[in-house]
Curated annotation (Swiss-Prot):
EC number: 2.3.1.189
Record-annotated N-acetyltransferase domain positions: 159-313
Binding site for acetyl-CoA 2: L241, G242, V243, Q248, G249, Q250, G251, V252, G253, R254
InterPro entries: Acyl_CoA_acyltransferase (IPR016181), Bact_Acetyltransf (IPR050832), GNAT_dom (IPR000182), Mycothiol_AcTrfase (IPR017813)
Keyword Acyltransferase among UniProt keywords: yes
Species of origin: Jonesia denitrificans (strain ATCC 14870 / DSM 20603 / BCRC 15368 / CIP 55.134 / JCM 11481 / NBRC 15587 / NCTC 10816 / Prevot 55134)
Subunit and partners: Monomer.
GO BP annotation list: mycothiol biosynthetic process
Residues noted as binding acetyl-CoA 1 in the record, renumbered to the chain: L80, T81, A82
Name of the featured protein: Mycothiol acetyltransferase
Biological role stated in the UniProt entry: Catalyzes the transfer of acetyl from acetyl-CoA to desacetylmycothiol (Cys-GlcN-Ins) to form mycothiol.
Amino acid sequence: MTTVLLTSTSGPLSDDAARSVRELVALETERLGVPPLSEQPLLNLRDPRARVVHIMDTQGGDVTGYAQLDVSREGGSLELTARCADRTQCVGALLNEAELIAQDHDVVVRPWVHGDDPDVTRVLAQRGYVPARTLLVLSRDLSLADTQALATPVVPEGFVCRRFDPISDADSLLAANSDAFSWHPEQGRLTHHDLSMRMKEPWFTPDHLHVVTPVSESARIVGFVWLKAEPHSRSIELYVLGVTEAAQGQGVGRFLTELATVTALNQGYPRLHLYVEADNTRALALYTQHGFAPMERHVNFTQPTGELGHEPPS
């Protein structure tokens, strides 16, 4: 049996530790076909404001197991991965440590499994965790026919569309995002700091973020679409598409979906993909009409029995 020696720390990781975690994630991404950690935990690695605890197993100077637990007031989200001689044992040890830390911070552990990771899924099932939420990744191939059909998306009457201005539009974008995603546990909480962190990422460009406003109120954003183009990727992500409650049902969402498709085509991407909640029937219907189909799933687990002294989420 392999000895698993864990260390845990809050606050930003050192450059070397963060680099080692990213290397672990890259290796496991190549093996699994899906990144085992999502975007936010990677942003948190060096963020001094992130309210998270980093849990690491280190062998020979390399990080061979990593977990990140959100210990904020609304927290409990856990993402983890490992590349050990006994991977199941390492995953179990990371989960044990996360559960103990969660008790100290009075949060409920809610682990994520991204894509198909049988080792993590098996450990969670053995501990009594059950699926509570599912994110779907939808994808569609782009073709010349799309270029001809969507050559000029038409802005709905009464609205105008323009490129995002990072200086003057930040407040309005965050307000629109909060309204459009008031029901969403992560996206609806986007802050100025979160937006700033994403705008510092190498993939960010204002050319990939468009906003829709009423003709008479050019500063009030009621819809927006944001594309994310990772370096060396053949697929571009429809990163966020949001429409405020008051603007829904007026064709804004359909227009923004068509705009995203045309933008991807014009920049030479053969594929467009996006994330959507499995129970968001309105969004699923819209994307299905535009040719998107499920490609992978990401499942969030919880313990309904309130084991380890935790209460289930209300």
